[in-house]
Amino acid sequence: MDLKKYIRDIPDFPKPGILFHDISTLLADADAWQVTMGRLANRVRVHHPDILAGVESRGFLLAAPLALKLGCGFVMLRKRGKLPGKTIGLDYALEYGTDRLEIQEGAIKPGQRVVIVDDLLATGGTLAAGIDLLHKIGADVAAAATIIELSFLKGRERLNVPCETLVDYQD
């Protein structure tokens, strides 16, 4: 199945000049969603994760059901102030300004094998920050996984871990 056929392209979103690859149409098609999750499971399984870390917010949509399918745990990497209790965070640079990812203290034990999951790999900034945060708490980051990669942006080069993707947009 060609998953690109189920991903809607929206020009000029979220700002002029950007072509947004919207996975909501893929999620809405039961067959395409099943195929996507099966393919992701096959790609992630080989990294033998103990736990999957989903990046806010579309990463949650993938990581939670994928963790169930693989029989491993799931944790959330969220933006500043969204998690209850004590958190550990990491600030990272954006094109204009900074952002922050946080994880609940104790959510991952030092040495646990983690695969970080998001919907899309573009410049690699968010995934790289998530990987750095996971390393900061002592996790063994085995890989990253996404549905979409915008390979022309070379984000994979920033990750320093294997990256599993299903659909590549080269321009």
From Swiss-Prot:
An example Gene Ontology CC term for this record: cytoplasm
Keyword Cytoplasm: yes
Pfam families attached to this UniProt entry: Pribosyltran (PF00156)
Organism expressing this protein natively: Granulibacter bethesdensis (strain ATCC BAA-1260 / CGDNIH1)
HAMAP family in the record: Aden_phosphoribosyltr
EC annotation from Swiss-Prot or TrEMBL: 2.4.2.7
Function, as annotated: Catalyzes a salvage reaction resulting in the formation of AMP, that is energically less costly than de novo synthesis.
Gene Ontology MF annotations: adenine binding; adenine phosphoribosyltransferase activity; AMP binding
Family: Belongs to the purine/pyrimidine phosphoribosyltransferase family.
GO biological process: adenine salvage; AMP salvage; purine ribonucleoside salvage
Quaternary structure and interacting proteins, as annotated: Homodimer.
Pathway participation: Purine metabolism; AMP biosynthesis via salvage pathway; AMP from adenine: step 1/1
Protein's recorded name: Adenine phosphoribosyltransferase
Taxonomic classification: Bacteria, Pseudomonadati, Pseudomonadota, Alphaproteobacteria, Acetobacterales
Taxonomy, superkingdom: Bacteria
Location of this chain's protein in the cell: Cytoplasm
UniProt catalytic activity: AMP + diphosphate = 5-phospho-alpha-D-ribose 1-diphosphate + adenine
Record's keyword terms, sorted: Cytoplasm, Glycosyltransferase, Purine salvage, Transferase
